[in-house]
From Swiss-Prot:
Glycans are attached at N71, N141. One of its GO terms (molecular function) is aspartic-type endopeptidase activity. This is Renin. It comes from the Eukaryota. Residues 1-23 form the signal peptide. It comes from Macaca fascicularis. The gene is REN. Residues 86-403 form the Peptidase A1 domain. It is found in: Secreted; Membrane. Belongs to the peptidase A1 family. The keyword Secreted applies.
Length: 406
């Protein structure tokens, strides 16, 4: 394993286990730090249980969903969380009911399972359920909410209550899910989702939670940032953190390099090329890239990823690309050209060994994903990229900043 990492069986999902401030300033503005832990993804759980992914059908490899509110369907295509590796914790209601959630820059709505979900839905049995009758601050709304995933439909209705995140409380409209398919959600370590995107992506134009936090004026800056610990060997180590209102200099070095968003409303930037070794192989004429905290891997169009995998000598196995483990350390660097700077991943960053596999094959943390217009075609830079580069999402200036993580 010289020079690269082994992916442990518990994977890289994160469980938020606490929050604190970086200090206690005398004024009312500050920024909050949320600590995170690791847990397994849905796909990892399926593989560990010996599930034949090929028999589940091709829809399980398509990391997309379509959101709808009432009779209106959004054109936003987002991750289906099959490979999501990071999640945290929020409280809903008075007193707070605690939920494990994915913090997703690719979506803008908040949803958790509801106590009104029938126990005929096995996935609801295995998750924490929000009980409105236990909250003194709950307000009924009732507007129908539907999330159509490639692997099944999640539906419910909108409600309003107080949500606590990172020590901040906000009054927030959120979805109470009453119907959710057993697969994949029965195996999900997370209960729901907190969208960190823009109101333009929000179904029903529901104000996103970060917008509501900003309206209170409690943060030092109109930004939030993500750090994912690259130490995959120690399950008890700090898994990472989300900072609301700033960035943590303990976890990056040097200065941030900023790239403006393509347009307001989506965390998407311009990319000027993808290099393998010293040769620019893809995106020579420019392309788009989402920065997606709800995704584990780096993804691109099928045609682009096939060309990239051919250059790396990787073979397709079901929905993954693999190489012989002894070849992993010899694979070339992959560089992403963003804002006039190259962001380089070594094989140690994008190759991992599945500890539940008896074969000496290692998986590449790069997948094919075809996203249609208007968002796509686009690349998506998920946890594989964010682990290497501390990422700041700047709402005030509509830009994303990267700095080398440490």
């Amino acid at each position: 394993m010289d020079g690269w990492r082994r992916m442990p069986r518990w994977g890289l999902l994160l469980l938020l286990w606490g929050s604190c401030t970086f200090g206690l300033p005398t004024d009312t503005t500050t920024f909050k730090r949320i600590f995170l832990k690791r847990m397994p993804s849905i796909r990892e759980s399926l593989k560990e249980r010996g599930v034949d992914m090929a028999r589940l059908g091709p829809e399980w490899s398509q990391p997309m969903k379509r959101l709808a509110l009432g009779n209106t369907t959004s054109s936003v295509i987002l991750t289906n969380y099959m490979d999501t590796q990071y999640y945290g914790e929020i409280g809903i209601g008075t007193p707070p009911q605690t939920f494990k959630v994915v913090f997703d820059t690719g979506s803008s709505n908040v949803w958790v399972p509801s106590s009104k979900c029938s126990r005929l839905y096995t996935a609801c049995v295995y998750h924490k359920l929000f009980d409105a009758s236990d909250s003194s601050s709950y307000k009924h709304n009732g507007t129908e909410l539907t999330l159509r995933y490639s692997t099944g439909t999640v539906s419910g209705f909108l409600s309003q209550d107080i949500i606590t995140v990172g020590g901040i409380t906000v009054t927030q409209m959120f979805g109470e899910v009453t119907e959710m398919p057993a697969l994949p959600f029965m195996l999900a370590e997370f209960d729901g989702v907190v969208g960190m995107g823009f109101i333009e992506q929000a179904i029903g134009r529901v104000t996103p939670i970060f917008d509501n936090i900003l309206s209170q004026g409690v943060l030092k800056e109109d930004v939030f940032s993500f750090y994912y610990n690259r130490d995959s060997e120690n399950a008890q180590s700090l898994g990472g953190q989300i900072v609301l209102g700033g960035s943590d200099p303990q976890h990056y070095e040097g200065n941030f390099h900023y790239i403006n968003l393509i347009k307001t409303g989506v965390w998407q930037i311009q990319m000027k090329g993808v290099s393998v070794g010293s040769s620019t192989l893809l995106c020579e004429d420019g392309c788009l890239a989402l920065v997606d905290t709800g995704a584990s891997y780096i993804s691109g169009s099928t045609s682009s990823i096939e060309k990239l995998m051919e250059a790396l000598g990787a073979k397709k196995r079901l929905f993954d690309y693999v190489v012989k483990c002894n070849e992993g350390p010899t694979l070339p660097d992959i560089s992403f050209h963003l804002g006039g700077k190259e962001y380089t991943l070594t094989s140690a960053d994008y190759v991992f060994q599945e500890s539940y596999s008896s074969k000496k094959l290692c998986t590449l943390a790069i997948h094919a994903m075809d996203i249609p217009p208007p968002t796509g075609p686009t690349w998506a830079l998920g946890a594989t990229f964010i682990r290497k580069f501390y990422t700041e999402f700047d709402r005030r200036n509509n830009r994303i900043g990267f700095a080398l993580a440490r």
